[in-house]
Amino acid sequence: MKFFLKTALASTMAVALVSTPAQASEVCQDGEIVIKFSHVTNTDKHPKGIAATALAERVNSEMDGKVCMEVYPNSTLYDDGKVLEAMLLGDVQMAAPSLSKFEKYTKQYRLFDLPFMFKNMDAIDAFQSSETGQEMKSAMVKRGILGLEFWHNGLKQLSATEPLLTPSDAAGMKFRVMASDVLVAQFKALDAVPQKMAFSEVYQGLQSGTIQGQENTYSNIYGKKFFEVQDSVTESNHGILDYMVVTSTEFWDGLPNDIRNQLETILREVTVSRNAQSFAVNEANKEAISATGKTIHVLTDEQRAQWKAAMLPVWDEFKDDVGQENIDAAQAINAQY
């Protein structure tokens, strides 16, 4: 069936078609509803890229003749900073930016950037599946954006040019952060210097010394080869990096009911399947990083408590934006894990 995996040519802005055994090369047919899905990661090592590929394969197989989904990975169409505006203009129909990228449209998702909010991925999954978590998917409806599903990446780790074992080790170092005021405050709490930078620019920033460190999941550290230009990784599990699959309310509400219902069902099934495997993907990437000879420092309970104590004041700074009731709901669930 027709499935597009768009990749950018190295020297131009052209987009090339890539076909694999699981993806036939026919173009979208006349009369089909075309859904362009734009994301910023690779297609085979990253939980989001794997999930987007799986979603398109299901849609193009099961909705042949009705819907055609094209996937544009690796920022070949838009980066996360521009994709939401493109979606509102109708140039993209689906995307899955990290939860940090919705600052312009809602402050509620700052909850997911607050350091040490959740103990593990099970707690995160339970909260996102709860009534409070599900209600948060509609936080941007008045701005024309509808949240469809939460997609997991994983827990964030720290990497730097020097070992990071205590909070004082980060002092004075420049760390890349996403465009999130919470993450800026998080690194300022460590007396570090946060620098907002696009995901696509991080490798070069680390290589050139513009930044000395960054926070990310193992899948991002391995998939984007950040480990090549970092001396070590610290397994801190201090935060989460998750995504929300979104669409525009105009596009979604304009779909025939049967089409919308079938898309919802397929997306839900892909989400459950891929979220369950995100931990294994990150663990495999962790092992791959270790196999290159890079050192991975696993914090002791005492060391992790020091990092938590240093970062926890950030909660108070943003509790009004997030909503104390949302923090309380998250912590009530977190206490069960």
Describe each region flagged by the PLM.
Residues 1-34, 337:
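Short, low-complexity disordered leader/linker segments with a strong preference
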Residues 25-123, 131-132, 140-337:
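N-terminal secretory/targeting leader peptides
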Residues 17, 135-140:
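Short, solvent-exposed secondary-structure boundary motifs
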